[in-house]
């Protein structure tokens, strides 16, 4: 595995790794290796949150992150192409923190896909220790035909509050 030290390189590696996982037509062994590789970019104890997601539950360990990534191919059924584009990394006054703007573009079921993302990521000792991943979950649900499931999850969440 390539050892990354620069926070921008690590976030770019995550984006490219997710792209390969989602659209790379990997066999089971390749998929497992890709999941391990992606998870290894995160610290054993981490704090990854998706504030705009319906569940909003934090990912606290490398194993949580791996399980999260393992769900990606099922969330993206029918994807023909899925790649990060327009990736721009903003350096901050804190050398551990970068803000990354990009979109995943591709196609699913013959329809174009464009999902906007902003990641605020803290990297220490070459691994991600904290990240806030703001993704367009409504756009993703629309692109992958999951709007009814998203609406049901939101309705269920409303009834539990």
What is the meaning of each model-derived region?
Residues 1-9, 73-161:
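A beta-strand edge to alpha-helix "cap/lid" segment located at domain peripheries
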Residues 1-40, 44, 150-161:
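Short, low-complexity N-terminal intrinsically disordered segments enriched in polar/charged residues
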Residues 1, 29, 55-56, 131:
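Short N-terminal micro-motifs specific to bacterial/archaeal maturation
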Residues 19, 51, 136:
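Flexible loop residues that form catalytic
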Residues 16-30, 56-59, 74-78, 98-101:
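Short, mixed-charge, low-aromatic patches
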